[in-house]
């Protein structure tokens, strides 16, 4: 590599024989996390756990300004007996210049805004109570806002890099989540 452009090198977890991307499980044109949730209800061997995890991923995507939340970045791992589990998260790319819009909408028929309010309104569809959802969003925001700078420093980020990426982690939606504890 000869460029000064930032890159990420990750070790991928998947075994191609046991992982299928969410977009391959149906011929329907998805566009919403609630569509993925419907599939989880049909195929998961632990649907409530997977629904909770999917909702947390929505909030995480919002809080880190993930620019790569399209359907091809959601998958399932074969769990045996014709059952599946939501795969570990992958292809998460914080983007400081990210428009506050998601690639995958939260609720069918809703906007594609990267909105904590919409995620909280949808929590019951993902089998979370509003109280639990608010608490989880707060804890996630607190962890992200408190730790992102050190995490980047630990990976060799410069002060300029930190300034560049600040808007990906510290923005209106992360502040809303932090206010949930008040």
Where are these regions (language model features)?
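Anionic ligand-binding catalytic core segments
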Residues: 1-71, 75-182
């Amino acid at each position: 590599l000869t460029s000064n452009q930032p890159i990420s090198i990750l070790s991928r977890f998947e075994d191609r024989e046991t992982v299928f991307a969410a977009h391959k499980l149906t011929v329907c044109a998805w566009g919403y996390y609630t569509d993925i949730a419907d599939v989880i209800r049909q195929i998961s061997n632990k649907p409530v756990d997977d629904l909770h995890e999917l909702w947390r991923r929505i909030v995480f995507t919002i809080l880190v300004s993930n620019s790569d939340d399209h359907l091809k970045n959601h998958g399932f791992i074969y769990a045996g007996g014709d059952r599946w589990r939501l795969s570990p998260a992958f292809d998460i790319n914080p983007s400081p210049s990210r428009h506050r819009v998601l690639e995958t909408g939260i609720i069918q028929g809703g906007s594609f805004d990267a909105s904590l309010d919409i995620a909280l309104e949808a929590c019951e569809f993902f089998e979370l109570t509003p109280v639990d959802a608010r608490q989880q969003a707060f804890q996630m925001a607190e962890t992200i806002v408190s730790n992102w700078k050190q995490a980047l420093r630990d990976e060799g980020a410069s002060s300029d890099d930190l300034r560049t990426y600040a808007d990906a982690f510290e923005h209106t939606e992360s502040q809303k989540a932090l206010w949930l504890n008040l």
